[in-house]
């Protein structure tokens, strides 16, 4: 169809539904620089205020998928699956989940992102491993998935380039938090990766982008409905982010946590519950398990047998990391020069955590970004974070700061003390997995 961008913008501005061919033409022009930044910004703002129905969101997602390459894994011989998280603090689930389900017979070509603001990024964590290539060429990406079972890499310029352009414009026009635009951005990249099934981790709480359960439900429902409408079988779990998920926040410190988890050292934790819940969902979707209970048992066996650890080690090695990384992580991971415990301000029960603020402490230490061009220090962060609901005595460490200087460490200790609330009575703690959306 002939494209008149301002007519499409006007129709959406006036609250009218756009036809799939209108959306496809607009996005195709956007990806080929046939749409000005002003027109793209106006379109994003019109969608922000007027919204989109399901059919429009499906059309937008498919158009953004088709703006670049779409990978095919027909020759892989395994079900192709992935998981996406909306982001939080201490969320290193992908690092363990990919090798666990790969050990159970799935192929996981995981396209991940970097951290921005208070949330950590999977790619930043992996880059704490010297030599690990988060941007391999397609041949190495395919070879890794084929030979290892999983590969965690970054988005290349050839996958959903329209999303990259539109996101950059949304970022500077206050249109990031639009459900239709979030949905299309997430799913276009996943569809371009050639997945057969997808699970979504929609986080809710004071450390998540979605602060209320109702908002999380709206986003989860939109993602599941649009993904299924686009031909990608998808389920979502809404998970709690009112405290860090793992006991570390940072980059090298979360890799250490990952290795401890894969070695069986995090049994019974909230992190284990979330990881195994997502593994079970993926295995049921791929018909490797008949029930979620069977899927969880298969995932637990992959973990306890050491097969998941072995696959993680192979992934690191094939993608350029040290071949003996698992045996000698301390030889390769950067260590901060200043390590300082955070004492409990008083005796009582850890009752609350300002999780977003805790994530910002990591950024202030140098372990995160406030703008995409910022450089990260992989060594800094927070470790040994106690979970909510435990009893502490005054002066007992509730976390440990890893900093580049004494001044940074002392400032972080004070900030972390302020992040935690200590009560006289044991608090009620939310479950780690709150709801399942299908």
Curated annotation (Swiss-Prot):
Belongs to the thymidine/pyrimidine-nucleoside phosphorylase family. Its EC number is 2.4.2.4. The enzymes which catalyze the reversible phosphorolysis of pyrimidine nucleosides are involved in the degradation of these compounds and in their utilization as carbon and energy sources, or in the rescue of pyrimidine bases for nucleotide synthesis. Pathway: Pyrimidine metabolism; dTMP biosynthesis via salvage pathway; dTMP from thymine: step 1/2. Keywords: Glycosyltransferase, Transferase. SMART domains: PYNP_C. This is Thymidine phosphorylase. One of its GO terms (molecular function) is thymidine phosphorylase activity. HAMAP family: Thymid_phosp. Homodimer. Disulfide bonds: none annotated. It catalyses: thymidine + phosphate = 2-deoxy-alpha-D-ribose 1-phosphate + thymine. InterPro entries: Glycosyl_Trfase_fam3, Glycosyl_Trfase_fam3_N_dom, Glycosyl_Trfase_fam3_N_dom_sf, Nuc_phospho_transferase, PYNP-like_C_sf, PYNP_C, Pyrmidine_PPas_bac/euk, Pyrmidine_PPase_CS. It comes from the Bacteria. GO terms for cellular component: cytosol. The keyword Transferase applies. It holds the Pfam family Glycos_trans_3N. GO terms for biological process: pyrimidine nucleobase metabolic process; thymidine metabolic process. Gene3D superfamilies: Nucleoside phosphorylase/phosphoribosyltransferase catalytic domain, Pyrimidine nucleoside phosphorylase-like, C-terminal domain, Transferase, Pyrimidine Nucleoside Phosphorylase, Chain C.
